[in-house]
Swiss-Prot record:
ATP binds at residues 11-16. Catalyzes the phosphorylation of the 3'-hydroxyl group of dephosphocoenzyme A to form coenzyme A. It comes from Gluconobacter oxydans (strain 621H). This is Dephospho-CoA kinase. Its main location: cytoplasm. Keywords: ATP-binding, Coenzyme A biosynthesis, Cytoplasm, Kinase, Nucleotide-binding, Transferase. Pfam families: CoaE. One of its GO terms (molecular function) is dephospho-CoA kinase activity. HAMAP family: Dephospho_CoA_kinase (MF_00376). It catalyses: 3'-dephospho-CoA + ATP = ADP + CoA + H(+). Belongs to the CoaE family. One of its GO terms (biological process) is coenzyme A biosynthetic process. InterPro entries: Depp_CoAkinase, P-loop_NTPase.
């Protein structure tokens, strides 16, 4: 089974690219969705987060605003949160890969924002990076805010500043998909990759 790693900075268009793979019948592990499930009601991460960050879990529900405040500007607190989440996500990721192998899937996608930072790119046969101009990304973040998201633009810029640079991601990627261009361009790149992998298998 070929493992396709998919990553990119915030609002770079990973979800769009992942949706294109799903449309082609390729199973996708969505790390962000996994985190939301783990932090959701009765999620496995809740008791650990509540213990590490008192006041962030109320009536078995995560107060995301309180958690953001607890880690804002505190690298050691963010590291503590990551130390809780990363092992739990890893368990779910391995379960996903095991299920894909059991079904004899020819390909699967690991959609992970921190793919390179946690070293998961090394296990991938192909690494794809979704990329968009900074102006496009900030516009997407603002649109999410108008759609009911709670993250401020200042918080988003802070997160972007802490992430790996686009230049470094590009350097380590096999393929760069520029989602700021037309959707058709991304579709063609995904189709070309799948065709290449099918030809090689």
């Amino acid at each position: 089974m070929k493992i396709i790693g998919l990553t990119g900075g915030m609002a770079a268009g990973k979800s769009t690219v992942a949706a294109l793979f799903r449309r082609e019948g390729v199973p996708v592990f969505d790390a962000d969705a996994c985190v939301r499930a783990l932090q959701g009601e009765r999620g496995k991460a809740l008791p650990l987060i509540g213990q590490a960050f008192p006041g962030t879990v109320v009536a078995s529900r995560l107060d995301r605003a309180a958690l953001r405040e607890a880690v804002r500007g505190r690298p050691e607190a963010l590291q503590r949160l990551e130390a809780i989440m990363h092992p739990l996500v890893r368990v779910e990721r391995e379960r996903f890969l095991k299920q894909c192998r059991a079904r004899h899937e020819p390909f699967c996608v690991l959609d992970i924002p921190l793919l390179m930072e946690i070293g998961e790119d090394r296990r991938c046969d192909v690494v794809m990076v979704a990329e968009a101009p900074m102006g496009t990304r900030l516009a997407r973040i603002r649109q999410r805010g108008r759609s009911g998201g709670r993250m401020s633009l200042a918080d988003a810029k802070g997160l972007l500043a802490r992430q790996m640079s686009d230049h470094e991601r590009r350097r380590r990627a096999d393929i760069v998909i520029r989602t700021g261009l037309s959707r058709g361009q991304a579709v063609r790149q995904v189709h070309a990759l799948l065709h290449r992998l099918r030809e090689a298998s």
